[in-house]
């Protein structure tokens, strides 16, 4: 099977300079969702028909498995599919999808293709309580589809029909090529309607069959920001439902956003207003507190992430305790039972098992050993204004509060750094290292008085 994706719409109602099919849904362009469905079907060829802002679309999403066809000017859906014909092979089937219908499901498309077989024209239709704006499916007395009439061309009786065309169809490429070559634009819009091929199929005694989607939401298109927001909520509810069916506890399934892939072990609990981006893996028994953002991370079993923490491109071992208000940045690796408390930031660092930085610290470009205690206010000074340098802290080190480690520097195994130390040279193992100005008490000193 070959797939044609129509993605040339202008999207004026979006009121955006970004082409409509690039508007984000669940963290990626709408068109990407449709491409994912086509790829899951193992389509032999995928052709994207682009128009408005097309070069931007192509630059953003171009890939080796995609063909591109430009529609200029834009003269309707039939004209759009015509532009893809040079990329299609007679003897195969063509599936027509839409770049602004992002929730179409693969099982639905598989049933549609099966219904088409090798010779039939298969249409995806839905029944709506309010079919305003959609082309109506017209059937004869025997229930056979005879044609589709667009709403602007429909009579009052035809407008009362509730079964509507979604635009998604499967047809033999050879027949599609012939039908499209016979299209006329003598209609209210002066456009070449793809739907007119149904009448041609009926006239040629080609069987026209219909399939209903698993959910109406699969066929909903997006023309405005409110509609985009509606589909976002539908999509997130579907994700939340699947997570709960897999055993994840969601404190409120209406308040989670997954903008990528979330893989969870057993007995995972996620509190409200959490956002997961990219690929995130949560081990057994992981608990994520409220208002956390987790991006491209792997979190080990039994780890607890307290509220308002941000985790990005991080690997965490089991039984860690993170937050609240902690931040791990790209390149962070945490061993077992690592504690990062409130207002601790870690970047591009490896922290080994059982080490702790419980509050108010910055650990950047560092290698931290096991059982290290990092006191409040500790900073690894890793940047000299031009280059980054690493800090090495060996096992069993105790770092007092308000300590600065000016990289490159090494703290030996079992060393203790006194509070307030500014370390500019390596600290030897098993020794106390302190660098402080001598404490003075000045007798008779008085605070300045504000002049009147």
Curated annotation (Swiss-Prot):
Residues binding acetyl-CoA are: 376, 382-383, 401, 419, 436
Q: Which GO terms describe its molecular function?
A: glucosamine-1-phosphate N-acetyltransferase activity; magnesium ion binding; UDP-N-acetylglucosamine diphosphorylase activity
The UniProt annotation puts the region (Linker) at 226-246
Provide the binding site for UDP-N-acetyl-alpha-D-glucosamine: 6-9, 20, 71, 76-77, 98-100, 135, 150, 165, 223, 329, 347, 362, 373
Cellular localization per UniProt: Cytoplasm
Among CDD domains, the record links this protein to: GT2_GlmU_N_bac (cd02540), LbH_GlmU_C (cd03353)
What this protein needs as a cofactor is: Mg(2+)
Catalyses: alpha-D-glucosamine 1-phosphate + acetyl-CoA = N-acetyl-alpha-D-glucosamine 1-phosphate + CoA + H(+); N-acetyl-alpha-D-glucosamine 1-phosphate + UTP + H(+) = UDP-N-acetyl-alpha-D-glucosamine + diphosphate
The pathway that the record names for this protein is:
Nucleotide-sugar biosynthesis; UDP-N-acetyl-alpha-D-glucosamine biosynthesis; N-acetyl-alpha-D-glucosamine 1-phosphate from alpha-D-glucosamine 6-phosphate (route II): step 2/2; Nucleotide-sugar biosynthesis; UDP-N-acetyl-alpha-D-glucosamine biosynthesis; UDP-N-acetyl-alpha-D-glucosamine from N-acetyl-alpha-D-glucosamine 1-phosphate: step 1/1; Bacterial outer membrane biogenesis; LPS lipid A biosynthesis
Ligand binding (Mg(2+)): 100, 223
Q: How does it assemble?
A: Homotrimer.
This protein's name: Bifunctional protein GlmU
